[in-house]
Amino acid sequence: MNTGDKAKSQAVPASGDIDQQALFFHRYPRPGKLEIQPTKPLGNQRDLALAYSPGVAAPCLAIKDNPETAADFTARANLVAVVSNGTAVLGLGNIGPLASKPVMEGKAVLFKKFAGIDVFDIEIDAPTVDRMVDVISALEPTFGGINLEDIKAPECFEVERRLREKMEIPVFHDDQHGTAIIVAAAVLNGLELAGKDIAEAKIVASGAGAAALACLNLLVTLGARRENIWVHDIEGLVYKGREALMDEWKAVYAQESDNRVLADSIGGADVFLGLSAAGVLKPELLARMAEKPLIMALANPTPEIMPEVARAARPDAMICTGRSDFPNQVNNVLCFPHIFRGALDCGARTINEEMKMAAVRAIAGLAREEPSDVAARAYSGETPVFGPDYLIPSPFDQRLILRIAPAVAKAAAESGVATRPIQDFDAYLDKLNRFVFRSGFIMKPVFAAAKNAAKNRVIFAEGEDERVLRAAQVLLEEGTAKPILIGRPQIIETRLRRYGLRIRPDVDFEVVNPEGDPRYRDYVDDYFALVGRLGVIPEAARTIVRTNTTVIGALAVKRGEADALICGVEGRYSRHLRDVSQIIGKRSGVLDFSALSLLISQRGATFFTDTYVSFSPSAEEIAQTTVMAANEIRRFGITPRAALVSHSNFGSRDSESAFKMRTALQLVRELAPDLEVDGEMHGDSAISEVLRQRVMPDSTLNGEANLLVFPNLDAANITLGVVKTMTDSLHVGPILLGSALPAHILSPSVTSRGVVNMAALAVVESSHPV
């Protein structure tokens, strides 16, 4: 790396055209988009001896004796090769293997981002079919699967066919089959909305390259009839007897007809499949198509007809493009990472038609479900509902892997190509959930306990918020809690319809209407009794109880009409804490509230306290917070190991802060003699046992601390934010400690999954108070 590059910022400059921004993005802070990271420690001589000579001989011999154990001892079962010769790079054509490398690196990071699959991009100087087959097939010992990319037709057909015959691992040409799978899912859903049978549907295609023919082949597998398919390319209709630009794959769709141009064939068509060139489908041609036509205009960057032009010509049309700025984007990332995930996990020898069909039906089915909040954000906050503008899911819908990978793995087993069939699909789905929702594994004990107390009522102060509405549906579906939502009924009902959610107010969950609840006067009286001597006059109390939903929720918990409160999705933390403090109050003996935050990173779970409440807690407050935090951590099925962190390392400094932490340690040991705790210590000593042993060999803390206790709010909150951002960690919390009754104040950045997590924790707290 050039030394000058080190100083370059990661941020892409906002000014300049897209090309300049892309060049900057690819060059800084280090060239390219990939790196290799070790998955085993290499910190000492012993590690080196195990990773390499002499220890590495043991797995080598095990694999020699039983080749299937390569999946146990190497990364092969999670490693895919993205292979290209650069002869048909999207939008660029035949630019050669070296120039195609940025595209292949991009494909690699998509595999990793969306499915956790490791990839080597391999660009080969192999212009002929024979050369490609020889080179790629020789890679079989290294990889668990091969993704062919950007190889021109018709060579790509022959390369894939021969490799599939020769290799015992999946070989998948994504340009063909990825596009075909998504197109097939869109066609299934589009025809269903139009009330049409695929066996009777007339399909007109513009384009006869690899992707177009793969789409048509898969539609035939779904039930379309070849006699109803009319294929056009640059030479016009593919008809029987035509000689120009014909090949064996195209010939199967040759029609016995005098039609020659698109205008001859388009009349009465139910589906237009475009994988050709911009502007091919004219408005006057679209006007001649059947009722409720499905338009797949997939030419990039400009489709065969622009959606707004198509809508003007045919308001009843359903339109898919390859562009992200229009609904129904046909983007291969919808499927290829998840198909490979399922294929790799069951040790599939190939990706067959049954597996592709399973993926089609999984994608089509997901579009009929309620979209996730992540998918909604991908649509600029407008939540799509299954219909003409939402035939296929967003590529960012996190549930894709949860639907596609198990379906593919199951189809592989049923069709006899899985070498390691998945025996327990519930456990497999749980594993995938942990990849999608990194909180899944850590939260599992909490959810298990919550389901045993699912009758418990959780009241949500911001009941009109989309994230809360989505969380309420998840809680009801999973049997975790009985939600009570504070909000205006008409707003809640409108938003439930907008977001496509099935839950029904006053049937599935209770609604507390702040504008007209019959308990209003009782709530006002109770509130005034609590705060009347805190400067709140009766008139103000009436206004607050009508307008402050956190106050309403806290009163409901105080009165026993709810078991736990969730608030803070909107507004400042301090305001919500004031209301909770005034109404619910602190648990007996608790000196002050405090907040516990959980970060889940690649290295595991780490808890931080106090991250939100006390600016400069006393030694007594720190000690009490440590014990409360340790008790809370045990709810996760985790044994707490606490480190009281400081700028001082086991007495190295005599500052007021260091003395406070030393005093807190003695108090913690008196309050909780069984708790594994030590301090005061540096942050790196808390994490690294090696460093800690150097300065304090007889430390009472073993291994890596999972609870970091800070001397003040600045240190805790700043560390939390820095670590969260630098490690791309998932934040669970903040968890409010010390309240008399279960109540948690979230942050405005929380996701619906975060709301679900905290609601489940609140249910457990209400059933098993400390």
From Swiss-Prot:
The lineage of its organism: Bacteria, Pseudomonadati, Pseudomonadota, Alphaproteobacteria, Hyphomicrobiales. It catalyses: (S)-malate + NAD(+) = pyruvate + CO2 + NADH. The active site is at K107. InterPro entries: Aminoacid_DH-like_N_sf, Malate_Decarboxylase, Malic_enzyme_CS, Malic_N_dom, Malic_N_dom_sf, Malic_NAD-bd, Malic_NAD-bd_bact_type, ME_PTA. In the N-terminal section; belongs to the malic enzymes family. In the C-terminal section; belongs to the phosphate acetyltransferase and butyryltransferase family. Subject to substrate inhibition and shows allosteric regulation by acetyl-CoA. Its cofactor is Mg(2+); Mn(2+). It comes from Rhizobium meliloti (strain 1021) (Ensifer meliloti). CDD domains: NAD_bind_2_malic_enz. The keyword Metal-binding applies. This is NAD-dependent malic enzyme. GO terms for molecular function: acyltransferase activity; malate dehydrogenase (decarboxylating) (NAD+) activity; metal ion binding; NAD binding. Keywords: Allosteric enzyme, Metal-binding, Multifunctional enzyme, NAD, Oxidoreductase.
